[in-house]
């Protein structure tokens, strides 16, 4: 259950991340850069799901749209991929199911496998119905949602990973670079070759942030650790991700990390008998004996307070970019063969992060940079990562 204190803490507003000047952001987790994911998502027919709660009282509507205070809240989620892929969309839908079960005044539904090019139609259909809030969970939905939000001021819109807002449209993301740093420490402690491979999606600030954070974490415990990066140029392409992982292993990497919406790279590492760290969702079942740990999401800690504010009539558009203290970005469970020494090191560092005693970027070229820069401008690697970020 989400208590009042936690709800307030988890609604961390980043006023420094205004929409102005953020137009260079190319894409974000689970989304696309241009039309990259359109083809893939379009190959699967969009499907819908619905679950129901119960109805309670009513009062008045907030300025930003949404239901009257105390009324049933009808919420819809739109996903870029199928929710069974154990990745980005899966993590969001796990949270949808959790809040649906928790609140008897909430009714939820979803549409999966929606290409960005088709998302405006889906958003409009929901807005024309009885939906009070629509969550668009991929970067490529940003402009379509922004357009639809203007035409439906009484509907609340929330967009994941983007930078545009309206009076009735908020945005949200988590500082996944914090658990990435911790997972990086684990990789730095288990590598014997001092060479760690990273299967990356797109060369965009969000992915570069994650690579850099993991490298900084690894080198904080092992200054000799280096990272090799292979770009897949897709969020979900299991065959290519597996090929990239195998290529990195052939180059001498004895630990494989990934930023993909499938466990393909984790599977490849497990098959090759090397350590591995996943992303988005717990992937221990695929890493087996060689599994380390993964940075994952618990979006319940965002969706819960957001829906509560809608139910209470207090919702306002904001820019959520919470860290591990919010419970949104986190680590999953350790693999079966991770040493206590590694666990203790990561636990101690996690405590420092949670107590605001450690800044991931301290001592790097990005120390002291603004949240705006970290969110949308980071475009180069830290020391220890081979090569350059493609332009």
Curated annotation (Swiss-Prot):
Function in brief: Part of an ABC transporter complex involved in glucose import.
Signal peptide, first to last residue: 1-28
Gene name of this polypeptide: tsgA13
Protein name: Putative ABC transporter glucose-binding protein TsgA13
Record's keyword terms, sorted: Plasmid, Signal
Biased composition, class Low complexity, residue ranges: 42-59
Alphabetical list of Pfam families matching this protein: Bmp
Similarity comment text for this entry: Belongs to the BMP lipoprotein family.
Spans annotated as Disordered: 24-71
InterPro entries associated with the record: ABC-Purine-Binding (IPR052910), PnrA-like (IPR003760)
UniProt keyword Signal, yes or no: yes
């Amino acid at each position: 259950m989400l208590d009042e204190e936690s709800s307030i803490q988890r609604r961390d507003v980043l006023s420094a991340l205004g929409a102005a000047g953020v137009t260079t952001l190319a894409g974000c987790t689970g989304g696309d850069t241009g039309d990259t994911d359109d083809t893939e998502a379009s190959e699967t027919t969009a499907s819908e799901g619905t679950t129901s709660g119960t109805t309670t009282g009513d009062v008045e509507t907030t300025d930003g749209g949404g239901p009257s205070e105390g009324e049933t809240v009808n919420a819809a989620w739109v996903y870029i991929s199928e929710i069974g892929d154990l990745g980005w969309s899966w993590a969001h839908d796990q949270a949808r199911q959790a809040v649906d079960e928790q609140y008897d005044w909430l009714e939820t539904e979803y549409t999966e496998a929606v290409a960005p090019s088709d998302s405006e139609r889906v958003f409009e259909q929901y807005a024309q119905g009885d939906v009070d809030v629509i969550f668009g969970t991929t970067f490529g939905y940003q402009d379509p949602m922004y357009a639809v939000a203007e035409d439906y001021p009484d509907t609340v819109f929330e967009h994941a990973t983007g930078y545009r807002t309206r009076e009735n449209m908020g945005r949200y993301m988590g500082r996944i670079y914090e658990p990435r740093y911790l997972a990086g420490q684990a990789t730095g402690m288990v590598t014997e070759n001092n060479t760690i491979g990273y299967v990356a999606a797109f060369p965009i600030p969000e992915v570069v942030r994650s690579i850099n954070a993991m490298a900084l974490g690894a080198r904080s415990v092992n200054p000799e650790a280096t990272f090799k990066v292979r770009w897949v140029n897709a969020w979900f392409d299991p065959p290519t991700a597996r090929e990239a992982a195998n290529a990195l292993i052939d180059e001498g990497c004895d630990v494989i990390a990934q930023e993909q919406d499938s466990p393909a790279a984790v599977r490849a590492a497990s098959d090759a008998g090397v350590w591995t760290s996943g992303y988005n969702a717990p992937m221990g079942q695929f890493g087996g004996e060689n599994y380390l740990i993964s940075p994952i999401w618990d979006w319940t800690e965002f969706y819960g307070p957001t829906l509560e504010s809608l139910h209470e009539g207090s919702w306002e558009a904001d820019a959520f970019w919470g860290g591990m203290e919010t419970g949104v970005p986190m680590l999953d469970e350790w693999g079966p063969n991770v040493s206590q020494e590694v666990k203790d090191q990561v636990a101690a560092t996690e405590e420092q992060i949670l107590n605001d005693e450690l800044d991931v970027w301290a001592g790097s070229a990005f120390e002291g940079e603004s949240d705006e820069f970290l969110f949308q401008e980071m475009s180069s690697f830290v020391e220890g990562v081979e090569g350059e970020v493609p332009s």
